[in-house]
């Protein structure tokens, strides 16, 4: 009977996991952590700990995923947040079914290519800072609906319960690490162009130092409000504030670069449509991999990479050679 390899987390890493299982063994250092009953992996140990605590308290994988994602919105706001979008790949053991939730951002209904042109010259505006540090590139967010859909289908916690640890983290604050400090430092000029962003990340006029405490009371307030009613985000006061910010970016007086408004309207928020999709299924050397389909390309390109690698006997190569073969293949697929 064919083995089944099921990935039930946010994101798609299954292809690489299976590939590594096929590579020759290499001496490994002792594990730094072991356990059973579940695992959580993120880029930040505080968010990871929140997910583990949810599991220890009896929550399931979906409860932990939402709580962890909300915490990442606090400690890793530059790449994760309630104002963005994403995907979920979920395996439900009860019915042996894999589903995917597509909560990616969507372009406003009136968006068009001309909006990215300089109104004075007609030339395409530079990507940074003009196009990405303005209202132009802001899509209609789907993260919150992704969380609520997953919890409603498979969770055991309410949205309020899942958001509670992140609310506490945002209110009490957290120690700034090197990654957070560098992100602010690298983007200082852009952050300083917007009053609210400046006040949050540059309260002293300079980037925070490692070890200082960062708080985000406005995010905590937002989490509290949507915990009571997610509709506030799409059809209530939060939605109106989002649209106002997109259409009238809160810049400082005389910002250092041109900041243009975006096209999002309250109708765009109201009309946002979440999609529950059939996953992409890939067979690889007796394993079955599931991942996100379009508009994500990860599973499709990953499947192409694995199809190519099936032509090589990786287990007959030493590990560095096998990894080089795999990396070269992935680079070609991603090009």
Residue ranges and their predicted role:
Residues 3, 20-21, 62:
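Residue-level micro-sites within transmembrane alpha helices that shape
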Residues 28-49, 53, 61-62, 66-235, ...:
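Noncatalytic scaffold domains of N-terminal-nucleophile
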């Amino acid at each position: 009977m064919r083995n089944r390899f099921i990935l039930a987390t946010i994101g798609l890493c299954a292809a690489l996991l299976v590939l590594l299982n096929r590579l020759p063994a290499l001496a490994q250092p002792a594990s730094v952590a072991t356990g059973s009953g579940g695992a959580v992996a993120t880029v930040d140990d505080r968010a990871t700990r929140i997910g583990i605590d949810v599991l220890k308290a009896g929550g399931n994988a979906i409860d932990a995923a939402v709580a962890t994602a909300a915490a990442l919105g606090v400690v890793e706001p530059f790449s994760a947040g309630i104002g963005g979008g994403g995907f979920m790949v979920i395996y439900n053991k009860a019915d042996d079914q894999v589903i995917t939730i597509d909560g990616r951002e969507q372009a406003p209904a009136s968006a068009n290519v001309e909006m990215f042109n300089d109104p004075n010259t007609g030339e395409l505006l530079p990507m940074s800072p003009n196009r990405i540090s303005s209202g132009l590139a802001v899509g209609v967010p789907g993260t919150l609906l992704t969380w609520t859909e997953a919890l409603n289908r498979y969770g055991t916690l309410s949205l309020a319960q899942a958001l509670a640890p992140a609310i506490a983290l945002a209110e009490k604050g957290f120690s700034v690490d090197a990654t957070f400090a560098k992100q602010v430092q690298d983007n200082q000029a852009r952050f300083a162009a917007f009053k609210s962003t400046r006040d949050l990340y540059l309260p002293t006029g300079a980037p925070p130092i490692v070890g200082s405490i960062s708080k985000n009371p406005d995010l905590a307030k937002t989490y509290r409000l949507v915990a009571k009613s997610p509709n506030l985000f799409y059809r209530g006061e939060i939605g109106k504030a989002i649209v106002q910010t997109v259409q009238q970016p809160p810049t400082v007086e005389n910002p250092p670069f041109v900041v243009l408004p975006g096209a999002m309207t309250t109708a765009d928020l109201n009309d946002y449509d979440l999609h529950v999709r059939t996953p992409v299924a890939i067979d690889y050397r007796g394993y079955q991999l599931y991942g996100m389909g379009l508009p994500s390309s990860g599973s499709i390109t990953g499947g192409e990479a694995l199809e190519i690698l099936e032509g090589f006997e990786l287990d007959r190569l030493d590990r560095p050679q096998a990894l080089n073969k795999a990396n070269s293949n992935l680079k070609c697929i991603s090009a």
